[in-house]
Amino acid sequence: MLNVFTLSNGRLVQVEIDQLSDLEQLQPIWVDMESPTREEKRWVKQHYGLSIPEDATGEDIEESARFYEEDNGEQHIRSDFLIDDEDESRSVRVAFILNQRNTELKSCGVLFSIRDEDIPVFRLLRMRARRVPGLIDDAKDVLLALFDADVEYSADALEGIYDDLKKVSAQVLEGSITDTYAQEVLADIAWQENLNGRVRRNMLDTRRAVSFMMRSKMLDAEQFEDARQILRDIESLDSHTQFLFDKINFLMDALVGFLNINQNKIIKIFS
């Protein structure tokens, strides 16, 4: 699927693309490729002269190969975005390509993103950029806004963990816990621990991507300050994830203790 966006009166406007000639009539600032077909990739490569790596969204890429600049001026960033579904939490790799220097290429000033599935953060940004004029001025703003939205989405996930652990804490403090309930709670806590760890790793990844943008000197003064604010927000989330790790470990130890007490009671009864 090709999602092509132009800028009109300070708002992102999505344009339907049915064939190659549709691209030739547009001056987009963002071309978002979600599970693109071979034909759609060919359109983008042919019109913009873009080099899309075959392993653009691969998971087994070395860290050093995820942030780099090509000789033709293309800057490549590969970053993970969080998906927090009710059934599972996972990270999805997204490849970004941005050319801000080589004006000889049609890709200049356009952000290209390649991903394998729908991501909540992308929907959130599209909704905001349509409703809030002036939120986006250029392709770099789009990329920064995506990272900012990912931090906000991760913060919401942490808030959900806080709420769930608050309920568990109340039950543990009451002291009336059956073995069956304790096992259910342990499974839930393990799920929360996995999500918390994923958020922490995701924020580490986002920090590296934003830091790369700052080092590459692609940002103007206002965008540089926006990037610094994103890093400050990530630093704030780090302390929350550490607190949650400590709380999760405490609750796990408490529940295991209750299970041991219950088992000792059963042993005494039979002995």
Segments (PLM) and residue ranges:
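Peripheral, non-transmembrane regulatory/ligand-interaction domains of membrane transport proteins
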Residues: 1-222, 226-229, 233-243
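Two-component histidine phosphotransfer core
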Residues: 243-250
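Transmembrane helical bundle of ABC transporter permease
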Residues: 254-261
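Bilayer-spanning, highly hydrophobic alpha-helical transmembrane segments
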Residues: 262-271
